Amino acid sequence: MPYIIEVVQAGRTVEVMKYYSSRYGKKGIKRGERKALTKEEQIKVNKRAAEKKLRRLINENFQEGDTHLVLDYRKERRPAGRKEMREDADDFLREMRKLYKRHGIPLKYIHVMEIGKKGALHHHLVINTPEEISQQAIVRCWKGRGRTHHNPLDDTGQYAKLASYLIKQSDGMLRSPDALQGKRWNSSRNLRKPKVLRKEPVKDKGWYNRIARLPKKLEQSYYLDGDSVQEGIHEKTGYTFFTYTFIKNNQTWKETELEWEKL
């Protein structure tokens, strides 16, 4: 039966997803029971989609040497709620834009606010941090509200664990009484979007291939992220899906999109 293949490039990563859909002839393909989702199941589906979107956004726009920045508060400077936290973040980002502008560099960021179960308040940001921008200068932009924790991104180009962590930290914001439309993060407008290399139905007489494999010409330029391989049944459609990610290790190789047609 036909299945859908989706191939998305985000920075050094290429994500592959294969799944069945009722739009493309389900005869002969067994699926789980399709039913209305409970509130908890819908939250799980939405959370997984948000994590995928955030992972791709980080992978596309940030790299080794950039920073996962955490801002916390002194006890006497703690804001009363989400609105005040947002105002503090806006002020910090204004100061950061001024700082970067002085060096002729655009600021790129993703911002997540955290309200912990015990009331802890933090701001998480993923920011570009070129050599011209010092940690001390960033600290000054926070204006003594609390500490700043600087965590440099590694050289893998795959920041799935960071995206998962940030989505988890954003859960508290959705529980906040003044949460707006379940929005988990804000970002600068200058971020690039991941590139969809393929998204189309594939004619096949049986099940899709459950092997995460590369086109032969790309075997020396990419490697499989073993942690990314997942197979399951989508809660909403009842159909199976299979997904995995390759990471580029040869920065000089310039593949063409046609080579991804061979998956």
What are these regions (language model features)?
Residues 1-119, 129-263:
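Right-hand nucleic-acid polymerase module
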